[in-house]
Amino acid sequence: HELIHFQQKYDGGNLLAACIKEGAADFLAELISGRHINQHVHDFANPHEAELWAEFKQRMHGKDYTGWLYSNTPGRPNDLGYWMGYKITKAYYDKQPNKQAAVQDILNIKNFDRFLEASGYGK
């Protein structure tokens, strides 16, 4: 995960960008290793995906990461934003016919709104 961050050519910003940065690192680490590093977060979030997406959509352009990244929130696991970014990144990767190009795209995102749109996630 941390080695992926070294390869990423972008910084965080709003919640969407920060979550994609973290989730892309998780996704690419899984692609390399074959294992989730945050399985407990996936186990919690997958059954609540629709509700979490609705909540995330309302906040994704803000800079308040509370409840999503780098904080403790009662009733939910830490770092749900990693999971959300993972889901968006995986959706993008799965849609791309050229997987090598998709990895390069993921490492070099310039516009996070366009990346989300291209992923088709949440549609």
Label every PLM stretch briefly.
Residues 57-123:
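Pan-zinc metallopeptidase signature
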Residues 2, 28, 87-91:
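Amphipathic alpha-helical segments in well-ordered regions
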Residues 1-3, 21, 58:
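A structural motif
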Residues 12-55:
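Post-HExxH zinc-binding segment in Zn-dependent metallohydrolases
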Residues 3-4, 34, 46-47, 63, ...:
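A generic structural signal for ordered alpha-helices
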Residues 1-10, 26:
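Active-site recognition of the HExxH zinc-binding catalytic motif
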Residues 9-15, 71-72:
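General secondary-structure propensity
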